[in-house]
Amino acid sequence: MKVTRLAVLNTLATLTVAWLPTTDKTITSSNGTDLFKASHGKIRGVNLGSQFVFEPWIATKAWSELGCEGQESEFDCVMKLGQDAANKAFAKHWDSWITKEDIKEIRSYGLNTIRIPVGYWMNEDLIYHDSEYFPHGGFAYLEKLCGWASDAGLYIIIDLHGAPGAQVAKNAFTGQFADTPGFYVDFQYQRALEFLEWMTIKVHTLHNFRNVGMLEVVNEPVQNPQVTTTLRSNYYPNAFHSIRKVEGALSIDRKDYLHIQMMDGAWGAGDPHEHLTDDYYAAYDNHRYLKWDPRVEVSKDSYIKTSCNDNVATNWPAIIGEWSLGVPDNVQETADWKPYSNLDFYQKWFAAQVQNYEQHQGWIFWTWKTQLDEYRWSYRDGVKAGVIPTDLNAVFREDVCKGRSS
């Protein structure tokens, strides 16, 4: 008997569905609306990229308005501007990049989840003030944002996007442009654990954080299991211990525990489950960008076929926490790939990815908005272009994957 991958995944979903917001904890808006009913419990969300960890390529105009033009990362910009000037500049950004109106718009598009990337420096007690340069004051804006999202009925994932010492080299998403990844040592792990404990206290004691159901303990570690050995043997088990220790001290009921998310084994940093002795409410994350996968033939048919058949996760339950409609730099402005003259292809590719990712626990698009003047990295612009439907169940009405089995 031939057992399909979809059949196996559906069986697993039946066995492990208890962790979902609709099952162990009803999440509703202030007027009682459950946004998960329309998605049958699947996560459908967007990342709030560049709100608290600025990636200059996403919004070069806003980066320049901060006074950061020519700087690689927040660390570099704060060092250039000076602490007081940087604090004032970033406060204006935090107050304007994602607003209450953005949250209303996200909800109106049929989405039910936001993922908020943050850096460890949001807990300002963890900053080495004599050698680290990050903007101060972000937490008040995070709390306000989570309050808006909770009122709207959105599920919230807080993601440790920027880890102490930087989890990868030369990438602004860590908050700095470090020459080498410095995260994978005990004292940096300890700083990250202190951040997770601090964040857990905030989530369970402040009303605005009531819809935060998941903490991701580090975003996109190095894709090399040899480099990340202690991440798996030390940091992941201790992250569970630290979060549960706080929840125990606060007498939190087990059904209200935070889900603890790690990068899935398919990410390439090894099996996150390898050394766990406690995996209660564990969750996993993978990021899928065909743009950077040299194994995939760069053709429209190949992209849709790959997305239809992609094995995107090895652990369960998994969320595809970042993905986009981005294509390789050397073809993205050619006739076959330009965004506004190839709407039909991008509609189908979006549908293929959603259909695949909802065989798991769902997806979170990267990102909500950009200043790129096109939609391949901007969910908001994708809706306005007609590539992304506001009725997300519509992507299942036309089977774009029919006849495209691997």
Curated annotation (Swiss-Prot):
Protein localization: Secreted
Keywords of the record? Carbohydrate metabolism, Cell wall biogenesis/degradation, Glycoprotein, Glycosidase, Hydrolase, Polysaccharide degradation, Secreted, Signal
What InterPro entries does this protein's entry cite?
Glyco_hydro_5 (IPR001547), Glycoside_hydrolase_SF (IPR017853), Glycosyl_hydrolase_5 (IPR050386)
Q: Which reaction does it catalyse?
A: Random hydrolysis of (1->6)-linkages in (1->6)-beta-D-glucans
Please list the residues annotated as glycosylated: 31
State any GO CC term.
cell surface
Q: What is its main location?
A: secreted
Q: Which family does it belong to?
A: Belongs to the glycosyl hydrolase 5 (cellulase A) family.
Stated role: Beta-glucanases participate in the metabolism of beta-glucan, the main structural component of the cell wall. Acts on lutean, pustulan and 1,6-oligo-beta-D-glucosides.
PANTHER family linked = GLUCAN ENDO-1,6-BETA-GLUCOSIDASE B
Q: What is this protein called?
A: Probable glucan endo-1,6-beta-glucosidase B
